[in-house]
Amino acid sequence: MDITTTKQFDSIINDTEKKAVLIDFWAPWCGPCRMLTPTITSLSKTFPNKVYKVNVDMQKEIAMRFGIRGIPSVKIFKNGDVMETLQGVQPESVYSEKLKYYSN
C-alpha cells in the first residue's frame, strides 16, 4: 500500500489500463492525514491493488511532480493520467464512488 520509490509509483500509475488507482498523498505530521488513514485502509481492503499512499516527506520528487501543496490530497489515476483530485478529508463513500466510476 505504501509507495516507496519513484520507479514503483510510475509502474503503478502507468499500469492502470484496465483499472483506476487511488493515491493518497500524506505526511505523518499532518493531523487530517492521520484522520484519513482508517478510510484509506478500509478502501485498500475493498479495492485490493487499487489504493496506495505516498509520504510526501519521503517522496518529495513525486509530490513536486504533481504539484502537491496541501495534504491530504487524494488523486485518482487512470492510464497514467490524473482523472480527479480530492483535497482534504472526505467520507469513504466519496472515494469509493470515484474509484468505481473511473474503473469502468
Predicted segments with their positions:
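Thiol-based oxidoreductase modules, predominantly thioredoxin-like and allied folds used
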Residues: 3-5, 25, 37-61, 68
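Short pre-active-site segment immediately N-terminal to redox-active cysteine/selenocysteine motifs
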Residues: 19, 25-29, 70
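CheY-like receiver
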Residues: 11-12, 62, 98
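The canonical Cys-X-X-Cys-His
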Residues: 30-33, 74
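Structural signal for short hydrophobic segments within the conserved structured cores
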Residues: 1, 52, 83-86
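A short beta-strand-turn-helix
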Residues: 2-20
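Non-catalytic, surface beta->alpha helical segment in thiol-disulfide oxidoreductase systems
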Residues: 76-104
